[in-house]
Regions:
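N-terminal Rossmann-like FAD-binding beta1-loop-alpha1 element of flavoenzymes
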Residues: 5-31
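Conserved flavin/dinucleotide-binding core of flavoenzymes
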Residues: 113, 118, 334-443
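Mobile amphipathic helical/loop "lid" adjacent to a hydrophobic cofactor/ligand pocket
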Residues: 72-198, 203
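Conserved FAD-binding subdomain of flavin-dependent enzymes
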Residues: 44, 50-92
Length: 443
């Protein structure tokens, strides 16, 4: 009897998991993961804290440190996947706050929850720069909504910094709203954000309801942590290998050779569901086109700290939000990496009264006694070179039995990674002969 084809999937983030799940009944899948857990940015940590100040009963519960939320409008594939897997979800929110040093000393704090939190600092009511920021915010929303509805954003390849200057948006708007908001979305530095193409920003923000006051999407989170969907996918795979870094991939006339520390195995096809630079490093025989595309995407390293030190949040509790941006006092630190504090109690249903926070690139020292874990993540930088490279990816797919998948092919989010994994699986499935498919199908 004909053996079903062997497919190697390198990387067990959302893209690799999606591809493996989609192909599990069509081929013999081997899923390789270098780290000690499956999921990539879908990473849940179990921590134990007392229920409250009045009830010291310790409760262990999962919290997410990477992928946290999705919405009901722009994540159609993820919604279908969760429904198919029977994943339980809960309501979440996308509230946003800013902490920044004022030019004349002191500290600015505001949050976009409601009018009261916008003016959490009553002095902002009489601050011309702050009021100018709000006026610019409304003008920015009107302008970008008009551009998006006209469908002309694709013509705007200019960097964001030039766009803001050309339309005379003030420094307060840029530093106290726009760059903080973009930093929360893409987890990259101010210098990198100002180099983003305008089209990318407008299209994403319009689709996600970020530049409109009404009719915004509803955000949700996985109840108990994203590991629940990861575990359901992994449970359906026969051959999955943790702590098994792939060292080299070589394409031959007979298939694809995958080398690990345990030896070299031959597969009929391979899906590289890793960051583009990692895929480039794994391939020992890249074509000029592969080298050009995979080498065009840059990544921003970000250090995440899971902790309970609420001192990093705005001083006024009324200004606390789900996403809390803190501007570095030294501009050179701000231009290097963005600082964000995710208040998990607002993002996920947690059983503790105590604030639980993930701080990305903290600018202030966190009390070591309150640190529970630390992680490092890399996020794609979607500059013009990256956008151009994305357009060339389809021409690479299937060449020498190799496929690529990753969130770097889109906006860098969970839906983008899922979409890329499903697309790679669909393309590969089309290359399988009917005999291959029959060999895997149950009798």
């Amino acid at each position: 009897m004909t053996q079903p084809p062997r497919i190697a999937i390198i990387g067990a983030g959302i893209s690799g998991l999606a591809a493996a799940h989609a192909l599990r009944d069509a081929a013999r899948i081997t899923l390789f993961e270098a780290s000690d857990y499956f999921g990539g940015h879908a990473h849940t940590a179990t921590i134990e804290l007392p229920r409250s100040a009045r009830d010291a009963t310790p409760i262990a519960h999962g919290v997410d440190t990477g992928f946290l939320v999705y919405n009901d409008r722009t994540y159609p594939n993820l919604i279908r996947l969760f429904a198919d897997l029977g994943v339980e979800t809960a309501l979440s929110e996308m509230s946003f706050s800013v902490q920044a040093a004022r030019d004349n000393g002191g500290r600015l704090e505001w949050s976009g929850n409601n009018l009261s939190t916008v003016f959490a600092q009553r002095r902002n009511l009489a601050d011309p720069r702050f009021l100018g920021m709000l006026a610019d915010l409304l003008r920015f929303n009107r302008l970008t909504t008009r551009i998006a509805q006209a469908g002309t954003e694709g013509e705007l390849a200019q960097p964001l910094g030039e766009f803001l200057d050309a339309h005379r948006f003030g420094a307060a708007f840029r530093d106290w709203y726009f760059l903080p908001m973009m930093g929360c979305i893409w987890s990259c530095s101010t210098a990198q954000m100002l180099a983003f193409p305008v089209a990318t920003m407008i299209r994403f923000c319009h689709n996600h309801g970020l530049i409109q006051i009404a009719n915004r999407p509803q955000w949700r989170t996985v109840r108990g942590g994203s590991r629940h969907y990861v575990e359901k996918i992994v449970a359906g795979l026969d051959d999955k290998r943790l702590r098994t870094p792939v060292r080299r991939i070589t394409r031959t006339d007979e298939g694809v050779l995958v080398a690990t520390d345990a030896g070299t195995e031959r597969f009929d096809h391979a899906i590289l569901a890793t960051h583009s630079d990692q895929s480039l490093a794994l391939l020992g025989d890249t074509s000029p086109a592969e080298a050009a595309v995979l080498g065009a995407i840059r990544y921003q390293p970000n250090h995440a700290v899971l902790h309970t030190d609420a001192a990093v949040l705005p001083q006024r509790r009324s200004a606390w939000a789900a996403w809390n941006y803190q501007r570095a006092v030294a501009s050179e630190r701000e231009s290097g990496r963005v600082c964000l504090h995710y208040l998990l109690n607002k993002l996920q249903p947690l059983p503790w009264e105590q604030p639980v926070i993930v701080s990305l690139n903290p600018v202030d020292e966190i009390q070591r006694s309150q640190v529970m874990a630390e992680y490092d993540y890399d996020h794609p930088v979607l500059d013009l070179a990256a956008i151009r490279a994305q357009a060339e990816v389809p021409a690479l797919q299937g060449q020498r039995n190799t496929w690529f998948a990753g969130a770097w092919m889109g906006y860098g989010f969970h839906e983008d990674g899922l979409k890329a994994g499903l697309a790679a699986a669909e393309g590969l499935r089309a290359h399988l002969s009917p005999i291959d498919a029959m060999a895997r199908s149950p009798a």
